[in-house]
């Protein structure tokens, strides 16, 4: 399978080298890296080219790298039933740099891009309906960013007396606890009953 993927990577470099920044086969999967401005042309080529035939759109997801200037990777997964192959297309983008929407090439990208927007704040130009899809309308922040607090910003609960949803500041029921310590089974000097044989001498 990796031989066929290497051949496909070589074919993509030859046929559309100007659209591709990198193409590598790693862990039995082909990953193609492109710039945002070349994304739509590359996805169209992968879908329409006879040698490729990546007509099945699987997923779009985001990956957060807060230490990089282009903080996010937008990752597209495609499947070619004819070739029985998968390809991953990666595009790097910054917090305020939009990526062209893939909905013109693959209409099924619609809700996946909305999810990436909702969870990471990744913007997509040309998207027909870019709004939150998983979180509440008034939700603040983007929960899958690595700098999003674990407790969130507000606590949402249903107030049975008021018969409505109530937003309140987060109130921790206990003080923050640091669990960075040795367990009772690590670093002990004594021998527990039954461990005499397992203990090195």
From Swiss-Prot:
Keywords for the protein's UniProt record, in alphabetical order: Cell inner membrane, Cell membrane, Membrane, NAD, Quinone, Translocase, Transport, Ubiquinone
InterPro entries (UniProt xref): NADH_DH_suC (IPR010218), NADH_quin_OxRdtase_su_C/D-like (IPR037232), NADH_UbQ_OxRdtase_30kDa_su (IPR001268), NADH_UbQ_OxRdtase_CS (IPR020396)
PANTHER family documented for this protein: NADH DEHYDROGENASE [UBIQUINONE] IRON-SULFUR PROTEIN 3, MITOCHONDRIAL, NADH DEHYDROGENASE UBIQUINONE IRON-SULFUR PROTEIN 3
Catalytic activity: a quinone + NADH + 5 H(+)(in) = a quinol + NAD(+) + 4 H(+)(out)
Protein's recorded name: NADH-quinone oxidoreductase subunit C 1
Organism listed in the record: Rhizobium meliloti (strain 1021)
Gene Ontology terms for molecular function: NADH dehydrogenase (ubiquinone) activity; NADH:ubiquinone reductase (non-electrogenic) activity; quinone binding
Function: NDH-1 shuttles electrons from NADH, via FMN and iron-sulfur (Fe-S) centers, to quinones in the respiratory chain. The immediate electron acceptor for the enzyme in this species is believed to be ubiquinone. Couples the redox reaction to proton translocation (for every two electrons transferred, four hydrogen ions are translocated across the cytoplasmic membrane), and thus conserves the redox energy in a proton gradient.
Family per record: Belongs to the complex I 30 kDa subunit family.
Enzyme Commission numbers on file: 7.1.1.-
Complexes and interactors: NDH-1 is composed of 14 different subunits. Subunits NuoB, C, D, E, F, and G constitute the peripheral sector of the complex.
Gene Ontology cellular component terms for the protein in this record: plasma membrane
Record Gene3D superfamilies: NADH:ubiquinone oxidoreductase, 30kDa subunit (3.30.460.80)
Cell compartments where the protein resides: Cell inner membrane
